[in-house]
Structure formats: C-alpha cells, structure tokens
Amino acid sequence: MKASIRVKLETLVERYEEVQHLLGDPDVIGDQNKFRALSREYSQLEEVTQCFQAYEQAQEDLVAAQEMAQEDDEEMREMAQEEIKDAKEAIERLTDELQVLLLPKDPNDERNCFLEIRAGAGGDEAGIFAGNLFRMYSRFAEKKGWRVEVMSSNEAEHGGYKEMIAKVSGEGAYGVLKFESGGHRVQRVPETESQGRVHTSACTVAVMAEIPEADLPEIKAADLKIDTFRASGAGGQHVNTTDSAIRITHLPTGTVVECQDERSQHKNKAKAMSVLAARIIQAEEARRAAAVSDTRRNLLGSGDRSDRIRTYNYPQGRVSDHRINLTVYRLNEVMEGDLGCLIEPVVLEYQADQLAALAEQN
C-alpha cells in the first residue's frame, strides 16, 4: 500500500473516532441537525474504518505466519504456508475494497431524487410502458424502504403516462437511481395488436438529485413565466374546476415544468419550483461533464432520448443493458422491482472506470 493512501486512511480513522466521541456529547445530542449530520458521517466512515482495521489485522497475520514458517517443526511450517496464503488473499481483497471506498464521492449520492419518466416514440404503447416503468421503480423503492411521492403526472388516454415526475425519498436514493437516466426501449406485442406483431416503443428516464434549499441556485422572478390552468385527466377531461395547475418556464434556459397533482395552486408551484431548480442544476452539471472529457464511457445516462441504455424484450423474457453489454433473462422479476441484477453490474463498471482514471493520473 502506498504511503499516501495509508496516511489518508489513518486520517479517516482519526476522524471516525472523533465523530464517535462527538455523538456522545450532550450539546450535539441536543442539536438535531448537527446530530443527524454527524450520524450520517459516522456511518460513512464506519465502513472504511472497519475495512482498514481488517487490512491491518491481515498484515499482522501474514507477519506471524511468515515467522511460523521458520519453525523446525514440519507440521507447523505446512500450517504456516496455509495461513500465509489466506492472509495474502485477504490483503489483496481488502486492498481492492479500500480502493473503491476511497474513490471520490458524489456529494449528491445520499440525497433524495426526482424521477422523471416520459413516453417517447410508440404512441399508446409508449404511454403504457411509462406506467410499467413507474410501477417497476415504485416496487424497487418499496423494497429499499424508500418513499415515492408523485409530483406531477400527465395520464395517457389508453393507460400509463405521457409524463410522470415523482420524488423518491430515502438514504442513497440518487446514488442508486442515477444510473437509470437514459432511453428505455420495449419490444412486445401490444394488447390491441390483432396480428401478434412485436412493436418497439420507447420512454426516457431522467434522475435528478434533490438539492437542499440552501444550495439552490438563485432564480430571478423576472426569468420566470408562470401560467395557471385547470388540471385535467386522461382524454382531457377536467378533474378540477379551479386554475390550480401550474406551468413554469425558465426563460434563459427554456426549461418547462408543469405540476397539477395538488388541489392547491401554492403547493403545485412549490413542487414545480423544486423540480425546476433540480433540472437547471442537472443541465449545468451535464454541460460541464461533457466539456471536461468525452473519451471515457459515460455510464451515467443523460436522460436524452437518443441515449439508449436498456431494452426490455418481452417475447424473449430478456433485459439488455447496452452500456456494459449485459443481458439477463429475468424480465418478470425486473418489472416487479428486482433491479439489483441490472444496477449493481453498472455500478461496478463505473467504479472500475473511476479506478482506471485515477491510475492514469498517477
């Protein structure tokens, strides 16, 4: 292990012990915001501290086994060789784990997020598939213990949605779901298809971190165009007799957000503003990322329609992730919210790319 890495790890262990002490301080316990922030930091430091302690123990075990290998007793030497082998394997495994734990963290990873699903090409079937995707993510969130709140929805005439925006609240929601941004394509026989032909439809998914109020960009009132209208359901029928729905246009960027799910115009405006701010920040971050480098694979989808990341093929019961050439024949389980088999391999590839980038820098 490099000396610089060891110094960094020792610093993190010191901070872990300091935070552990602070959490027992009555002044901290009495300040809920500070206590919550330190508890979050403690849980983040705990994993790397335990991993480093296990690494140090494996190093000690290796030294002890190497000393045992010098014994005169043949049986002891054989036992020592086994222990040397085990210790070296543990050191190698723990070194890899520590490298991943030391990768730069996205400060947004622990935050809640906005999940935006839009029907694309494919007519009615695209809207139905948008509904399927929302159900899939809702089931996944339920399994993770997260909460899903509909922010805005525009129902399609024959089921599903033209557009759906939901807020997903829970620890690490953005860090997990951010890999879902991009184009999602479905291949299946629509219920209305009498000839049994397979149709291809598409939806786009965009995942944006919810930004704390203190970190929100300043949005000038003069830069906003705010329209009010009556909320409507599928087929255009009115479900509200007052102009409670809100459409906000950010004139400098052309970003538009609609919200009509609340009966109160004030609540719809508040929801729309939070989504608008998240969209503006995401667009700026995407622009910066594109300017920095286009040479390395971007496993974080843009949410753009042309950025196809996944295909769901119903006749074959398969789901393919085009970013990492992964195919799994577990379509039914995936649509019921078992997304781990798709998300985890992408996360591992993303970490491998980060490690490769760090190696190039060094």
Curated annotation (Swiss-Prot):
Signal peptide: none annotated. The modification N5-methylglutamine is found at Q237. It comes from the Bacteria. Pfam families: PCRF, RF-1. GO terms for cellular component: cytoplasm. The keyword Cytoplasm applies. The keyword Cytoplasm applies. Methylated by PrmC. Methylation increases the termination efficiency of RF1. Transmembrane segments: none annotated. It is found in: Cytoplasm. SMART domains: PCRF (SM00937). GO terms for molecular function: translation release factor activity, codon specific. Keywords: Cytoplasm, Methylation, Protein biosynthesis. PANTHER family: LD18447P. Belongs to the prokaryotic/mitochondrial release factor family. HAMAP family: Rel_fac_1. NCBIfam families: prfA, PRK00591.1. Peptide chain release factor 1 directs the termination of translation in response to the peptide chain termination codons UAG and UAA. This is Peptide chain release factor 1. The lineage of its organism: Bacteria, Pseudomonadati, Pseudomonadota, Gammaproteobacteria, Vibrionales.
